[in-house]
Amino acid sequence: MLKQIQKFLKLEAASGILLLVSALLAMIFANTDLNQLYFSFLQTEVAIKFGAFSIDKPLLMWVNDGFMAVFFILVGMEVKRELFEGSLSSYQKAIFPAVAALGGMVVPALVYWFINQNHPEYQSGWAIPMATDIAFALGIVALLSKQVPPALKVFLLALAIIDDLGAIIVIALFFSHEMSMQALTIASIAIVILVAMNRYKVTGLINYAIIGTILWASVLKSGVHATLAGVIIGFCIPLRGKNGEAPLHHLEHALAPWCSFAILPLFAFSNAGVSLEGMSLDKLASPLPLGVALGLIIGKPVGVFLFSYVAVLLGIAKVPEGINLKQIFAIAVLCGIGFTMSMFIAGLAFGEEEASENMLALARLGILMGTFVSAIIGYFLLKITTKPSLMKAA
């Protein structure tokens, strides 16, 4: 179990560096003479036709709706594995990170709402600061990996996985559009087939790829966000086959490098490019970016730590052995690294109409500010609270 976590941490740490480079490249492209090339490339129309069925979308939407669906297959499999075999497989293991994750979703949303309560045009962005970017957060932890207790890494992993699950629920409930009953019917049939294949332990992954593609296309056409199809596919991959095979582990192992080193960096490059032309300090301090940034910088750590602390006081949960509340607070600050997941939700909240483009740019600036500040403060807090001398004193 520990070896698997160490491999995962190494992978995500490398991915975090690549994400940072991708975001910096996007900002350079968006704010130099290359900006026209960058934005026109992202708006290039790409169409797929199969008889009467067709999908015609800009390249940016293929990244956000298509490639990110593959990432959410991985998320679905990770959540399933942790629920059945890992750090969320019992009430005692799950309750502490679950309560922390709940606080990390509720309080940032409240901070954003409080700052934007008099601006109805911005209020659809309330979910943006709820998210945590696991790759970036683990990248920071990896910089101090020799002195960070294993239990603290497991806590962050469990919290982030529950956080992802919360983001999935929010996307399903609040960011779906007008429904197409025909497409939903096809999607429902595909889900029934996937569940049946899981029930009868069908291990041929090509079968899941075929039915999964049908599910993704029908969900895309239905008005529900297409990435949710990825989560469903991930959940339907069997943990064990009839002859002891482990299809979920094999697919997770195969997809993880592609998601870490291709899909997430591509998503970051496609979504982090914000033109600063016409931006002023007044705009940067306006309610939308301020609500997002403060939701991540203040709301996340306060929510994660406060809910954890109250749960311990009430006897609902116990602090995992080998770590202390000071270290929990350092991890809570790192949870303010929203980046890719926050960018994803911002695209859903403000990305559909042309009139929303300015709001989306402001939201992205808020995410970049919140992520940067949370990463810097979180790093130094984690470094201080995990010093061997302090850990012995605790």
UniProtKB/Swiss-Prot annotation:
Keywords: Antiport, Cell inner membrane, Cell membrane, Ion transport, Membrane, Sodium, Sodium transport, Transmembrane, Transmembrane helix, Transport
Protein name as it appears in the record: Na(+)/H(+) antiporter NhaA
Entry's family note: Belongs to the NhaA Na(+)/H(+) (TC 2.A.33) antiporter family.
GO cellular component assignments: plasma membrane
GO terms (BP aspect): regulation of pH
Catalytic reaction list: Na(+)(in) + 2 H(+)(out) = Na(+)(out) + 2 H(+)(in)
Functional description taken from the UniProt entry: Na(+)/H(+) antiporter that extrudes sodium in exchange for external protons.
